[in-house]
Amino acid sequence: MQLSPSEISGLIKQRIEKFDNSVELKSEGTIVSVADGIVTIYGLNDVAAGEMIKLPGDVYGLALNLNTDSVGAVVLGDYEHIKEGDKAYCTGRILEVPVGEALLGRVVDALGNPIDGKGEVATDLTSPIEKIAPGVIWRKSVDQALQTGIKSIDSMVPIGRGQRELIIGDRQIGKTAIAVDTIINQKGTGVKCIYVAIGQKASTIANIVRQLEEHGAMEHAIIVAATASDSAALQYIAPYAGCSMGEYFRDRGQDALIVYDDLTKQAWAYRQISLLLRRPPGREAYPGDVFYLHSRLLERAARVNEEYVEKFTNGEVKGKTGSLTALPIIETQAGDISAFVPTNVISITDGQIFLETDLFNSGLRPAINPGNSVSRVGGAAQTKIIKKLGGGIRLALAQYRELEAFSQFASDLDEATRAQLNRGQRVTELLKQKQFSTLSVALMALSLYAADNGYLDNLEVSEVIPFESALHALAETKYSDVIAEINETGKYDADIADKLKIIVEDCKANQAW
């Protein structure tokens, strides 16, 4: 086939028009060492701190050390195929994770990849794992209660929406049980929950997922899992990933709760990474910025005002405040709360729930020590009826603890002291609560009213829990309208007090326990 000169010139013109003369600029470096999940890269002069670096085999690294002529990065995934001499490239992006409603009911890893076998997460939205916390001007004071359903917490150490409340104690003492009960109690309240498991066994996480599913709580929960078999890098970034997922709800005028279980293991992972990166060790071999590790995470839990939500959503959501409540967990060694990481997190948070081994072993569960436990901002958020009735509980316990030690040395006690000891014993018994048996505001108020007004004083200590069960059963069947009214309003006045009195006296008269 012969082409005429005009056709040839036409083809040449077409080729010239289609010719792509764009230049692709890539910042390239060479891997000079790889060991223990840390790669050292020569070159990459344009890399930024916290930037993702593309490594061979569709694996990414996180730039943490920026030296004069090299970059120290931690590998996010498998690094066995990476070898000396391989090329690495800048991406110009910082690490992002998927966010959105589609994550509810799912179990994901620290990078947001699903690990529950239910297929891909149907969301296109992503968010950086590192964000600056809202400034003072965008915040609103904490004045809405976050009910845990646990008597000893809601009455003595109340938690508000947007608060950071530390749960601290030794291992195997019920820290996770409190967090799981709190997540279960948010069912039907509209509060979205994120549970971040750091450095736990996969079987333990599977058990928590099963418990949440059994109690219908997975519908409003996201599980972010960085198991003990995952790399230190994934255990380090998991809390930040979970926080970004919670901020999605906070910034859109909704309420969210995030549990970090536990931040001690995150600090261990960060210490491991820092030592491998040859950063100078400080106290307990932790790096100098271990305080900042936790402070920048926990400061992101906040209650934001209407203006912040309206600005963030470009006016789509108006007149709504958002909140992210954080329940960080810290594991102590033999009750030592003066160690480095516990003291750091105590100083960052708005209060702590201190669990004690001796109380746990004596059968008091949840094993909360009311003397060391405090809520710095939750009092303003406490439900009115619980605040009114819970004050007497704390006082009775404080007097009981003081007199209990004294009474061991005194043989003859006056009537008033004996009455205080009796009241304290019964209040202590009343605060015992089994796991997965959270209470509504009304039923909790009923129990507190009975204790406050001396209705438990003439019962045997062993009869307190059966009496409470009978009281709740009677209230839910015969006085359901009163229970519904208290749950709806949360107020306390003479009328409500009279109604509570009628219920308690009815139960006492029947002696149905």
From Swiss-Prot:
InterPro entries, per this entry? ATP_synth_asu-like_sf, ATP_synth_asu_C, ATP_synth_asu_C_sf, ATP_synth_F1_a_nt-bd_dom, ATP_synth_F1_asu, ATPase_a/bsu_AS, ATPase_F1/V1/A1_a/bsu_N, ATPase_F1/V1/A1_a/bsu_N_sf
Q: What is the protein's membrane topology class?
A: Peripheral membrane protein
Q: Where is this site: Required for activity?
A: 373
Where does the protein end up? Cell inner membrane
Q: What Pfam families does the database record attribute to this sequence?
A: ATP-synt_ab, ATP-synt_ab_C, ATP-synt_ab_N
Which Gene Ontology CC terms are recorded?
Answer: plasma membrane; proton-transporting ATP synthase complex
Give the keywords, sorted: ATP synthesis, ATP-binding, Cell inner membrane, Cell membrane, CF(1), Hydrogen ion transport, Ion transport, Membrane, Nucleotide-binding, Translocase, Transport
**Molecular function terms, GO-annotated:** ADP binding; ATP binding; proton-transporting ATP synthase activity, rotational mechanism
On subunit structure and binding partners, the annotation says: F-type ATPases have 2 components, CF(1) - the catalytic core - and CF(0) - the membrane proton channel. CF(1) has five subunits: alpha(3), beta(3), gamma(1), delta(1), epsilon(1). CF(0) has three main subunits: a(1), b(2) and c(9-12). The alpha and beta chains form an alternating ring which encloses part of the gamma chain. CF(1) is attached to CF(0) by a central stalk formed by the gamma and epsilon chains, while a peripheral stalk is formed by the delta and b chains.
UniProt-listed PANTHER family: ATP SYNTHASE SUBUNIT ALPHA, MITOCHONDRIAL
* Function summary: Produces ATP from ADP in the presence of a proton gradient across the membrane. The alpha chain is a regulatory subunit.
Protein name (record): ATP synthase subunit alpha
Give the gene name: atpA
